[in-house]
Amino acid sequence: MRNPLLQACAMALIGLTLAGCASTPAPSTIADTTARTPQLSTLNRLIVEAGLGDTLRSQGPFTVFAPSDDAFKAVPAKTLAELGSNKELLKSVLTFHVVPGKTMAADVKNGNAKTVNGANLALGKAGTMVTVEEAVVVQADVAASNGVVHVIDRVLLPPKQ
């Protein structure tokens, strides 16, 4: 290139392209998203206790129906104590909230979805309202690099086995 103006424009374009790439943060994983969301602090603590952090940082994709802190406050103290003392039960309950694949709220259909723990979750949709078992999605489509998180208003308990 002999034209100095053309050279300057090309260099500016390259610089802007590189600057744009550098300023775009990598999306957070589901585990990182729950960890930095204040209303999911109880869920995050339980994910750590159950040893599921690495799973929720893996490639996925996953759809997580994440009970809010208020949802955990509604769980009887006896049930919470049992979850705290039984790691396998805790894992079973938490993985009952996780469905393989990435399902955005707009894509939810009435029917069942198989969870990571092997049980089925009943999903429902009426207009824009999405339900999961008896829970209502109160915040939908929280994007993560390995899936999506939907905040729900209840803790889901898997069927007795």
Annotated model-derived regions:
Residues 2-161:
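Mature, structured domains of secreted/extracytosolic soluble proteins
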